Amino acid sequence: MKNFSLLTTIEGLRRLAPAYDLICTRLPIPTDQDLALPIGGKKNNLTRRSWLNFAGYCKIPERAAVRLLNEQIATTESSVDLIYASFLPDKLKAQYEAIVRQNTAILSA
């Protein structure tokens, strides 16, 4: 792991943060790759099947991987709501929404 963050609970327990360093680099750098590290040898144009194959490689049962992908897809509208509640300029909000919807369509196919 290169970038990670720890959270400390009230009880003093430490655990990995569920998300860290999340930023849409497509807004400032439209030609940026989808991923920094390859999944199945690819950094771009990953499909739902690409992610399911990677889950299999990681020994995650396909049923669980499908459930996780579907849960991600189900967060689309709340993700878009967060975008529009942000301090981004309106033009960038619309571009960010388009990226989220494009990625959702890919995961849904």
Cite the ranges covered by each PLM segment.
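Anionic ligand-binding catalytic core segments
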Residues: 1-109
